Amino acid sequence: MIEADRLISAASNQPEDVVDRAIRPKLLEEYIGQPQVRSQMEIFIQAAKLRGEALDHLLIFGPPGLGKTTLANIVANEMGVNLRTTSGPVLEKAGDLAAMLTNLEPHDVLFIDEIHRLSPVVEEVLYPAMEDYQLDIMIGEGPAARSIKIDLPPFTLIGATTRAGSLTSPLRDRFGIVQRLEFYQVPDLQYIVGRSARFMGLELSDEGAFEVAKRSRGTPRIANRLLRRVRDFAEVKHDGTISLDVAAQALDMLNVDAEGFDYMDRKLLLAILDKFFGGPVGLDNLAAAIGEERETIEDVLEPYLIQQGFLQRTPRGRMATVRAWNHFGITPPEMP
């Protein structure tokens, strides 16, 4: 099953991104959740502006859908500079990165999404650019090859990744600021859902907003996606007003349960409970049992289940927790 096909996927979706961009906060004072990140960034940005310097290079990591791109936009807005956006897979050659860097104005922000997917050749170009604001490029080939240095204006590189562990140490060490985004609390998501509903002109009760937030897996992108689908249900099946009952009916119809689990989450947990008696089970066996790639399990399915206390990673494999047994109303087998 492809991650982008899941309703509760946190993967980016192009048509939705257009709407999401319009309702994203533009400044730190509008930024909801992540209190530690917000308070730290307020200080770092104010200090850089007082000194008249570019902000230190910033690495943002965490699960998808938590607002890494939003935070990059906010930083550029707060600094009053331009934001140039690209992604790791797009920068195939050193020249691609060099072209972007040489077009930056002083203190501009260059945002590289999925920075862990940069090729080694491109990454090598980044090192002197980040440290010394210089490009060191080889011209020509063979005996005639020569190195030229190009001075760059001071700039801020913001890298975003869902896999901080995949970054090389030399790249990771060149970021002066590192911020981890955590899953959102339900009250913060409720506020985000309410704000989005006002932007979309919807009648949404506080209880309805809470129900959508509760099932959004701690992720604003999922919350906004669920809100749009609940809106569709409310307009077709009811009078367009989203109450607690309407939200619950819509989300039940969409097969998103009270914990925010969809079919794939339940399939994974039930496989561990039913086929492997709660575990431990190795990742390869689990992948074969549910017909998924091991990378999909590690990067997409597991993080939220572990964070919510339904799944454990142990040296011997994956294990379901007591909370998982209770969620499905299954009695754990007696230990021998």
UniProtKB/Swiss-Prot annotation:
Region (Large ATPase domain (RuvB-L)): 4-184
TM spans (from-to): none
Database matches in SMART domains: AAA (SM00382)
Lineage: superkingdom: Bacteria
Binding site for Mg(2+): T69
Enzyme Commission numbers on file: 3.6.4.-
Residue numbers binding DNA: R294, R313, R318
Compartment list: Cytoplasm
Keyword Chloroplast: no
Main subcellular localisation: cytoplasm
Assigned protein family: Belongs to the RuvB family.
Subunit structure: Homohexamer. Forms an RuvA(8)-RuvB(12)-Holliday junction (HJ) complex. HJ DNA is sandwiched between 2 RuvA tetramers; dsDNA enters through RuvA and exits via RuvB. An RuvB hexamer assembles on each DNA strand where it exits the tetramer. Each RuvB hexamer is contacted by two RuvA subunits (via domain III) on 2 adjacent RuvB subunits; this complex drives branch migration. In the full resolvosome a probable DNA-RuvA(4)-RuvB(12)-RuvC(2) complex forms which resolves the HJ.
The protein's name: Holliday junction branch migration complex subunit RuvB
Originating organism: Enterobacter sp. (strain 638)
